Amino acid sequence: MILGNILKKNGLKQGIDMKLLAGDLPTGVASTFISPDGERTFGTYLGAAATMKAENLTLDMFKGYAYLYIEGYLVQDHELILRAMQLGKEAGLQICLDMASYNIVEGDLEFFDILITKYVDIVFANEEEAKAYTGKDAWGAINEIASKCSVVIVKLGAQGSCIKKGTECIKLEVPPVKKLVDTTGAGDYYAAGFLYGLTCGYSLEKCSIIGSILASNVIQVVGTTLSKKKWDEIKLNIEALLQA
């Protein structure tokens, strides 16, 4: 529980309403191995996370929110992810799915298709994950996925990102990066910035700009924690770009 308590304390400090379940096993851990070029590989111990069951979820947990963001890793428990999405829909939330990993997608392709077609409103994927799902390159993949959900975002690494909603298509370049140190958290920061933009009512282009700014900053540090000074700089940068 030590790591779990640290997570809870930090979340509450940031004003997050933490809905955590306690179990007998230790908190899960993901050890990150960073290569010289800044790419990363995870070694994971799921711990208590593996004991979470569909019956642990209640409708009250989903009330008062606008979006439910689910990592594709959760598809390993079909019953759990289905209940989460069903409760989210019942509570009136938009469902966001991050495909998580191309091998996860390849290993459960039919189930991913059911989720996206029936429940998911917004899909986040990188180029490899989108190709694993559709068998097509970036634009071919984005067109196919967009035919099954409301919004699809395909992240292209250093090449930026593609976003499509209906007939609206956007291609954005990535902000300049001084030095790539560690790609851990880049996708999560992008999604966080994008969803923040949506909750503020910004256009898809501005949502993507915010996500790209966050992602480009986190890859320049080891780990996923940015200093208060850096956050202040990021906020000013975002405000300037949004007003331009």
Protein language model regions, located:
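Hydrophobic beta-strand scaffold residues
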Residues: 18, 95-96, 152
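Conserved phosphate-binding/catalytic region of the ribokinase-like
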Residues: 86, 90, 138-244
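Short, acidic/turn-prone active-site loops that include or flank metal/cofactor-
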Residues: 46-49, 100-102, 175-178
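Short beta-strand scaffold segments in enzyme catalytic cores
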Residues: 29-33, 41, 160-164
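Alpha-helix C-terminal capping/helix-to-coil transition sites in glycosyltransferase folds
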Residues: 63-64, 118-119, 148
